[in-house]
Structures are given as structure tokens and as C-alpha cells.
Amino acid sequence: MAYAVVDFETTGILPAYHHRVVEIGVTHVEDDGTIRGRWETLLNPERDLGPQHIHGIRAADILDAPTFADIAGEFAALLQGRVFVAHNASFDMRFLQAEMERTGAWLNGGTPSLCTMTLGSNFGVGGACSLVSACGAFSIDRHLAHSAGYDAFAAAQLLRAYLGGSATWPGWPDYWRQASDAARHYRYPELAQRGVTWKPRPQGTSAPQSFLERSSTGASRETVTGAEAQYIALLDRCLL
């Protein structure tokens, strides 16, 4: 067990303002970079869908979709024992915390997590902090981009490229090993698994290109890290 790469599509950017997760994608990646499994589902957010032009999900798509509470047990089991990985992980972690709290569960502090966006500065990605730009730097195909399932799979392939590229770099094998070891000892809330059927997004549907994808063709790559990278990623979610 090693990594659970996650992507959320949401009704907005601030869980404190009652924005909710409307789609989950999870891809498992092993220590050696092998991709072991993929899961995804639309979710009924129990509110309006927010900016549908961003996530591309229609009201008809979620009529018989489960709620987060319906699948929280199965989702937590997919995360258990694995490092939580996402592109702009701080964004997804905030929503994970908020959604878990709505079920009456609380995450223990110090959830082991990695951010493929932040890590990119170590692998020649530079300021291309969007997922599509980072994947482009490694020739990773993003078929049907902007669905949670495909974005999680794309980020998983990006993580695999990082793992392979750093296998012989001084200090990096220990870095990955320590993250994986921490995850093995971390406990997610143990929630009842309800056995509710997951509902993937209909095949062939995706959201439009993001603002940065439409406007960054041929843009130079400057080094952007930390808070700057997170700000740009947040801006990208707003400017569609």
C-alpha cells in the first residue's frame, strides 16, 4: 500500500461557505509507481450544483447519485493506509475535512499527504502549476479532462513519473518511504460501509477547459512554489 490519488469536483471553492463535493475520483498507486485501481462517483451535494460550466455536471446526472455520507465508509477505506495525494492537495484536504465532519466524523491531525503541484518544481515543471500543464511536461494524455476520475488518474500518472524520475536521486527514496510509512500508521475514521452503488459520470462528458489551459499556450515556465502556486491554482478554479 502506498498512495491514494484523489480529485474532487466541487460546487465552489470554500467549504466554510457550504460548498460541497459533487464528484470523487480515486486512483491507487503502489510504491513502485504501479497503478492498481480506479474508482469514481458523482455525488448529490444536497444543494444546488453551483457553477455547472466549471464542472460540467447536470442536475439530471445526480438525481440517483449517492450522497457523500452514503459512500464515506467505502471512501475512507480506499484512503486507509495510503498517502493522500492530490494536485493542489490543500484544496482537496479542506473539502475532505469538511465532508467528513458533516458525517459526524473527524480526521486525526497530521493526515499524510503529498501535492503533485508543489512537487512539480523539483521535476522541471516550474510555474506550470495546472494539472494539464504538468501532465503535458511528461507527455501524459488527459483524455476527458475535468472529470474527477480522469483527473485523479492523470495526477496518478504524474506521481508515477515523479517516483520513477527520482528513484536514483540522493534523499528521494527516503522521502517517499517516510511518507508511505507515515500513512501506514495513520487511521482514518472507521465508518459503516453502506454498500450504496457508486455512480460514475456518463462516458464522453467533461467540463470545459480551465482559464489557464485556454490562455497559457506557449507561456514560459517560471518557478512558482508554495503559497504562490496554491493561489494560482485557486485563481484557475475561479476564472472560467
Regions found by a protein language model. Give the residues of each.
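Conserved non-catalytic scaffold segment of RNase H-like nuclease domains
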Residues: M1-P112, G124-H146
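Acidic, divalent-metal-coordinating active-site segment for phosphoryl/phosphodiester hydrolysis
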Residues: T11, S147-A161
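Short secondary-structure boundary/hinge segments and terminal tails
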Residues: V21, D70, T118, A152-F153
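Short, charged low-complexity intrinsically disordered segments located at boundaries
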Residues: I57, A105-N108, G126-C129, A148-Y150, ...
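Short, surface-exposed recognition loops or helix-turn segments adjacent to catalytic cores
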Residues: G110-L114, L144-F153, W172-W176
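An acidic intrinsically disordered interaction segment
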Residues: M117-V125
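Acidic two-metal-ion nuclease catalytic site recognized across multiple nuclease folds
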Residues: R160-L240
